[in-house]
Curated annotation (Swiss-Prot):
Source superkingdom: Eukaryota
Lineage of origin: Eukaryota, Metazoa, Spiralia, Lophotrochozoa, Mollusca
SUPFAM superfamilies from the UniProt entry: Nucleotide-diphospho-sugar transferases, Ricin B-like lectins
Domain Ricin B-type lectin intervals: 466-595
Region described as Catalytic subdomain A: spans on this chain: 163-268
Biological pathway: Protein modification; protein glycosylation
Protein name: Polypeptide N-acetylgalactosaminyltransferase
Species the sequence originates in: Biomphalaria glabrata (Bloodfluke planorb)
Catalysed reaction equations from the record: L-seryl-[protein] + UDP-N-acetyl-alpha-D-galactosamine = a 3-O-[N-acetyl-alpha-D-galactosaminyl]-L-seryl-[protein] + UDP + H(+); L-threonyl-[protein] + UDP-N-acetyl-alpha-D-galactosamine = a 3-O-[N-acetyl-alpha-D-galactosaminyl]-L-threonyl-[protein] + UDP + H(+)
Length: 600
């Protein structure tokens, strides 16, 4: 009799435990619900998380546990368990496949253990590996607070409640663990959970595979490791091909997302799937990792050397932006590292040019392609993402970064620039001899998409880019033997010097206008004193300023001031910079030739 009572007590205790489990399954907290499921073994009523598919409950097991319970109680318990099972199955349908994603919430990831494996040893150079201060990065937690740099109007802005989800794609090679983890954590912290379908980390064959493998444990994080070095371009395509989100969001591996960065991007893509949108890119100091808000008055552009640069918006554009600070900003080019694009539109547009190598020029190519093939490029002011800007690349390029950039850039130019490619060659003469390989597939893509000519792009998207053939007498680099006139990195009130010609434009790109201005960007070579032997300087171009007016004498290869018998001279450039001396046709240091001149 006692044995029978004990047996009944054990059974009732078991039923009580089952009731608690059923109660817990009815909770509304999905993450807690998932955690409880994980904690159950595979031999009970619930399937273990590691199983790929949910398996039906085994009626035999249930009956074995409950076979001595009164029929009425058994029926009630069966009904509750069946209801819980159905809830579980429906919830599982909404979750990503368990075999593809980790099961550790980002807040429970062992940050210290992950970062400590690459901690600097005493005496090690903190800049050596990543070209930013690794010690400073490692000392900052992954969930640190950064200032909200958005315009105040953004804080009251509302976005669609039915936004598409996104796959965030991050490629990396030997990235600092602390910087990579901080990027991931900022995405989770600053984004609505339901909008992040997954974060895809593409490890471009880092020296230590565990850099990415250990992050694979985090929920919603997938890691794809290349079996050899493929570079950013192909790595991004690899990530995009496995993405399941409706929108692709590309980020660099050393970023920090700001408040509500994602919603305005997705909202704009939802409004028009052909909108390709980028956040305002704030600056994270490479030295101390301070987070600094960037100007909202900038848009992406380029010179005829096809190197990306930031342009200030025109006065008209700035006035419009003042009236509506949250309005999208049309941009001729995106920086390339951070943007969102509808996945189907990305595929339809031809993804990236896979015959480009490693890195460089891909932002130029996709910007041309989006605009010329009926899309839009925009910067979204209410979206802010910080980025660590470095002075040099932390890794080597097979073949050399300069050669790869030249090849990639020329591929883009050959496909998209039509007859205007001549001005690229004038600015970068060395590009004429670069072999770009077969571009027939990209030309066929352009035909298939019925894309617009580059002339349309210049007239409708980037009218600020001056067309040399119309406005200039001469253009490109100003040569003196193997050396070229160079700004030496100076801006307004800066002197000029000589530097070996690198044929890459930039500091060596000038033009001679019909008005006689020797221009570099919006700066003009200016006579500061009419006495011989005084340096010339770069000052803001002012229409009609006689001190900024020179004439070219092709017969004598001189650049002579329009009103004075003074010619640009490099005789003392190492001590005073370029000076204006009395013109001397026999002087070698006064001989200058433009790489492209209408007078020749």
């Amino acid at each position: 009799m006692v044995r029978r009572k004990l047996r009944l007590l054990v059974i009732l205790a078991g039923i009580w435990l089952v009731g608690i489990v059923v109660y817990l399954f009815k909770g509304d907290d999905q993450s807690e619900f998932e955690k409880r499921v994980i904690d159950k073994g595979p031999d009970g009523f619930y399937v273990h998380k590691e199983e790929k598919e949910h398996q039906p409950f085994q009626e035999e097991n249930k009956a074995e546990v409950l076979h001595q319970v009164e029929d009425q109680w058994k029926k009630k318990q069966d009904a509750e368990i069946t209801q819980s099972r159905q809830t579980f199955i429906e919830t599982k349908k909404l979750l990503p496949p368990d075999d593809e994603l980790g099961d550790i919430p980002w807040g429970q990831f062992d940050e210290l253990g992950y970062i400590s494996k690459t901690t600097l040893k005493p005496g090690q150079d903190p800049y050596a590996r990543n070209k930013f201060n690794l010690q400073a990065s490692d000392n900052i937690k992954s969930n640190r607070h950064v200032p909200d740099t958005r315009h105040m109007n953004c804080r009251s802005e509302t976005w669609s409640q039915d936004l598409p989800d996104t796959s965030v794609i991050i490629t990396f090679h030997n990235e600092a663990r602390s910087a990579l983890l901080r990027t991931i954590v900022s995405i989770f912290r600053k984004s609505p959970d339901h909008l992040i379908r997954e974060i895809i980390l593409v490890d471009d064959f880092s020296d230590d595979p565990s850099d990415g493998q250990e992050l694979d444990k985090i929920k919603k994080v997938k890691v794809l490791r290349n079996d050899k070095r493929q570079g950013l371009i192909r790595s991004r395509v690899n990530g995009a091909n496995m993405a399941k989100g409706k929108v692709l969001t590309f980020l660099d591996s050393h970023c920090e997302c700001n408040e509500k960065w994602l919603e305005p991007l997705l909202d704009r893509v939802k409004q028009d799937r052909r909108n390709v949108v980028s956040p305002i890119i704030d600056v994270i100091s490479m030295d101390n990792f301070d987070y600094i808000g960037a100007s909202a008055d900038l848009k992406g552009g380029f010179d005829w050397n096809l190197v990306f640069k930031w342009d200030y918006m025109s006065a008209e554009e700035r006035n419009r932006q003042r009236q509506n600070p949250t309005a999208p900003i049309r941009t001729p080019m995106i920086a390339g590292g951070l943007f969102s694009i509808d996945k189907s539109w990305f595929d339809e547009l031809g993804q990236y040019d896979l015959k480009m190598d490693v890195w460089g020029g891909e932002n130029l190519e996709i910007s041309f392609r989006v605009w010329q093939c009926h899309g839009n490029l925009e910067i979204i002011p209410c979206s802010r993402v910080g980025h660590v800007f470095r002075k040099q690349h932390p890794y080597t390029f097979p073949g050399g970064s300069g050669q790869i950039f030249a090849r990639n850039t020329k591929r883009a130019a050959e496909v998209w620039m039509d007859e205007y490619i001549q001005f690229y060659f004038a600015a970068v003469p060395s590009a004429k001899h670069v072999d770009v390989g077969d571009i027939s597939e990209r030309l066929a893509l352009r035909d298939r998409l019925q894309c617009k000519p580059f002339k349309w792009f210049l007239e409708n998207v980037y009218p600020e880019l001056k067309i040399p053939s119309v406005q200039d007498i001469a253009f490109g680099s100003i040569k003196q033997g193997n050396d070229c006139m160079d700004t030496m990195g100076h801006f307004a009130d800066g002197i000029l010097g000589l530097y070996p010609c690198h044929n890459s434009g930039g500091n060596q790109e000038f033009s001679l206008t019909k008005a006689g201005e020797v221009k570099h960007l919006d700066l003009c070579v200016t006579l500061v004193d009419t006495r011989p032997g005084n340096e010339v300087k770069l000052y803001q171009c002012t229409p009609g300023n006689y001190k900024q007016q020179f004439v070219q004498n092709p017969a004598k290869d001189q650049l002579r001031h329009k009103s004075y018998d003074l010619c640009l001279d490099s005789v003392v450039w190492q001590t005073k910079g370029i000076v204006a001396n009395k013109c001397d046709p026999s002087s070698y240091t006064q001989k200058w030739t433009f790489s492209l001149s209408k007078n020749r």
